[in-house]
Amino acid sequence: MLAKGLSLRSVLVKGCQPFLSPTWQGPVLSTGKGAGTSTSSPRSFNEIPSPGDNGWLNLYHFWRESGTQKIHYHQMQSFQKYGPIYREKLGTLESVYIVDPKDASILFSCEGPNPERFLVPPWVAYHQYYQRPIGVLFKSSDAWKKDRIVLNQEVMAPGAIKNFVPLLEGVAQDFIKVLHRRIKQQNSGNFSGVISDDLFRFSFESISSVIFGERMGMLEEIVDPEAQRFINAVYQMFHTSVPMLNLPPDFFRLLRTKTWKDHAAAWDVIFNKADEYTQNFYWDLRQKRDFSQYPGVLYSLLGGNKLPFKNIQANITEMLAGGVDTTSMTLQWNLYEMAHNLKVQEMLRAEVLAARRQAQGDMAKMVQLVPLLKASIKETLRLHPISVTLQRYTVNDLVLRNYKIPAKTLVQVASFAMGRDPGFFPNPNKFDPTRWLEKSQNTTHFRYLGFGWGVRQCLGRRIAELEMTILLINLLENFRIEVQNLRDVGTKFSLILMPENPILFNFQPLKQDLGPAVTRKDNTVN
């Protein structure tokens, strides 16, 4: 049945049957003018508003006026100039950009059973040149689907997620101990400083414990320098990707530029360390017969012979690499917003303490009793999405805003610009988690895309959501969180969005003793 408010031309294009697919349920689209439907004949692709077809000239102006680190602001300015849809060619990369949630719903509804998204060119170049194995991040079609179905059962299914709670709770409690060590070191009754490195280690400890079922020791006083190398390599891999987004990576490789050398070196460390961890834990697991707790994703994959070992290695590598900077950045932004909005922080703390009493300390139950806290993560990703855009290659010809979009066109949904648009989010600069608790579909429909959408959404979504929720519960129980930055820290694009300037936090213990408050039975706040 055709969704109300959409013209036949907007949805039922060649081969697109988003509401009839037997494998997944399409969305119910809301009515309104946002989708720009029209009964007139669709206009041509070349008529889409654009700065011009000279990709190199466009790239020159982009570098001169904005620079790669400000691409998210460049997109906002482009929507203000051209309207809700525009196309732009930067160097060799041409895309159509959209910002309206209704347009996003049409795009994603027509993505088909095997969606294809944009692959970061230097990542592809590295994997091809060095013949590295690939997982679901790089695969497509049936090869992608085969791996993804198996991995969904291990890291997305509700039954699997329950296994991760005790592992992640232990990591979160150890992070609280890290902050108490910092307080003791400063000898001032609180801790003031930057916690980005600690959050990187926390995220790596969390994802590795879920995958391997054992701890890496990243939150101990003395950190394994080899594990720290892995974390540093992930950061370097993201950072060095940006210059090669709009120019052929082979150009950088053939000229033996420092950018390519650093990028390849980072991937080398990621692969070598991930393979080493996988092999070591594999042999340890083979010798074990009795497990007192969930033995991890790797054991489950190996024990069931669910995938070839090389496929397992490739996917484990991608999950490890993708689970460090992304989660840690979202946590840092969440704390930043809470510190700037103390009333919201107190509301969240009250919810957490009530959940602790109701669940009697059972973390698996607690995470089901904190809807406002979960909404705060959504609100954080609205203001500070990890990815500037979500991308899909159109499977068939499509019509958006009454423009013809040919098959195999790269269309990007500008998630950062959408989240800052007052047309979609009233008072968009306000950190207001309650907006996500409203029942009206008009306030939330296709507006939350923090982890992507559909069958190709982020594989680690459920792990990341649980990891962040459990840590925030522990932090809110233990500390009042403030920020020392008087001005906005700014945002820069380094393949993911991150603070332009260091965030200086202040953690004030809520209890007189410096031991982890979560170990106490009472829930009073002194």
Curated annotation (Swiss-Prot):
Q: Which Gene3D superfamilies match?
A: Cytochrome P450
Classify the protein's membrane topology as the record does.
Peripheral membrane protein
Some GO term, biological process aspect, for this entry: which one? C21-steroid hormone biosynthetic process
Question: Keywords in UniProt for this one?
Answer: Cholesterol metabolism, Heme, Iron, Lipid metabolism, Membrane, Metal-binding, Mitochondrion, Mitochondrion inner membrane, Monooxygenase, Oxidoreductase, Steroid metabolism, Steroidogenesis, Sterol metabolism, Transit peptide
Cofactor(s) required for function per UniProt: heme
Q: Which GO molecular function terms does the record list?
A: cholesterol monooxygenase (side-chain-cleaving) activity; heme binding; iron ion binding
| GO cellular component terms, semicolon-separated | mitochondrial inner membrane; mitochondrion
Q: Where is the transit peptide?
A: 1-36
Binding positions (heme): 458
* Start-end of Low complexity biased regions: 30-41
* Enzyme Commission identifier(s): 1.14.15.6
Q: In which pathway does it act?
A: Lipid metabolism; C21-steroid hormone metabolism; Steroid metabolism; cholesterol metabolism
Q: Which InterPro entries does the UniProt record give?
A: CYP11_CYP27_families, Cyt_P450, Cyt_P450_CS, Cyt_P450_E_grp-I, Cyt_P450_sf
Q: According to the UniProt entry, where is the signal peptide?
A: none
Extract the ranges annotated as region (Disordered): 30-49
Q: Reaction(s) catalyzed by this protein?
A: 6 reduced [adrenodoxin] + cholesterol + 3 O2 + 6 H(+) = 4-methylpentanal + pregnenolone + 6 oxidized [adrenodoxin] + 4 H2O; 2 reduced [adrenodoxin] + cholesterol + O2 + 2 H(+) = (22R)-hydroxycholesterol + 2 oxidized [adrenodoxin] + H2O; (22R)-hydroxycholesterol + 2 reduced [adrenodoxin] + O2 + 2 H(+) = (20R,22R)-20,22-dihydroxycholesterol + 2 oxidized [adrenodoxin] + H2O; (20R,22R)-20,22-dihydroxycholesterol + 2 reduced [adrenodoxin] + O2 + 2 H(+) = 4-methylpentanal + pregnenolone + 2 oxidized [adrenodoxin] + 2 H2O
List the subcellular locations: Mitochondrion inner membrane
Note the subunit structure. Interacts with FDX1/adrenodoxin.
Sum up the protein's function in the record's words.
A cytochrome P450 monooxygenase that catalyzes the side-chain hydroxylation and cleavage of cholesterol to pregnenolone, the precursor of most steroid hormones. Catalyzes three sequential oxidation reactions of cholesterol, namely the hydroxylation at C22 followed with the hydroxylation at C20 to yield 20R,22R-hydroxycholesterol that is further cleaved between C20 and C22 to yield the C21-steroid pregnenolone and 4-methylpentanal. Mechanistically, uses molecular oxygen inserting one oxygen atom into a substrate and reducing the second into a water molecule.
Instruction: State the name under which the record lists this protein.
Output: Cholesterol side-chain cleavage enzyme, mitochondrial
Give the species this sequence originates from.
Answer: Mus musculus
Q: Point out the gene that encodes the protein.
A: Cyp11a1
